[in-house]
Amino acid sequence: LKCGALESGRLLKIIRENKFDYGIAFDGDGDRAIFVNRVYGVIEAEKLIVLFSKLLNQGNKTVISTEICNKGLEENLNNMGHKLFQTEVGDRIVVETAIEEKAILGAEPSGHYYFPNCSNTMDGLIAVFYFFELLEKHNNNFIEVIKSLNHFKRIKKDIPIENTQEINLDSLRNNIKPMINNPNEKLIIRQSMWDPVLRVYYDYK
């Protein structure tokens, strides 16, 4: 159908043609929400995670996300005095870790959001309510606030593999790790759960 969270480009086209300010796309089961702005485009989930965690700034300041989150997320949260705990990819892992760590928020770059204060699972609709609260709080300056947050440039490559059993990811990571010694860089190598590829993410300023 070419719609929903995986087709945010179509939503963006519609709101620009009709001169709407914002648009929201869900996935099939509603645990994921993507937010777009007519001028800015698709709003990065990592930036919303920062702003959501600021709204939820009560007691524990731990935020859970996955290892493939943009390096900018960690930098932004550190600047706020919050702690980022990174897990393997998977919404269930994020939720379980958030519960264990008593985190104020769990989220993935894909647009999955878990709010422990009012839900026991990922919920895109709750994210929408908090998004509206952000719009009300920042009024006409919301996009300027979004622009002010750090977000590193990213190169992403999928490397086809034939025999996954022959790949020692720990050894590969250990060999590459010494090459990435700049605090303004981040390299993640992981095996896809669905496709016969290695996914490589490199963030840099």
Task: Please place each PLM-identified region on the residue numbering.
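Phosphate-binding chemistry for phosphorylated carbohydrates and sugar-nucleotides
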Residues: 1-138, 142, 151
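Catalytic-core signal marking the mid-to-C-terminal active-site face
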Residues: 138-205
